[in-house]
Amino acid sequence: MEYEYPIDLDWSNEEMISVINFFNHVEKYYESGVTAGDFMGAYKRFKEIVPAKAEEKQIFNTFEKSSGYNSYKAVQDVKTHSEEQRVKAKK
C-alpha cells in the first residue's frame, strides 16, 4: 500500500525510524501476523517517543485515515497474548 506515516519533523531520525517500525508492526498485524513480543517491543519504543495519550490518539487517527489500520485495536488485541504467540487481526 502507498500511504504516508504520521511523522513529527521535530523527532530525530532514530525516533522517526522507531515510529515507522511500530507502524510496520501494525501493518503486519493486519496483513500477515506478528509475534506479540515483537509488536509490544515496538509499541514500547513508540511510547518512549510519544508518551502523551492525546498525541498518541492523534497519531493513530492520522495513520488510520491514511492506511485503514486501527493501531489502537491492534495494541489492545496484542496485549492479551503471550510474547511468543503469533497474532493476526480477525477478518
Swiss-Prot record:
Pfam families per record: UPF0223
InterPro entries in the cross-refs: BH2638-like_sf, UPF0223
UniProt cross-references to Gene3D superfamilies, sorted A to Z: BH2638-like (1.10.220.80)
Domain of life: Bacteria
SUPFAM superfamilies: BH2638-like
Family: Belongs to the UPF0223 family.
Protein name: UPF0223 protein SAB0963
Species lineage: Bacteria, Bacillati, Bacillota, Bacilli, Bacillales
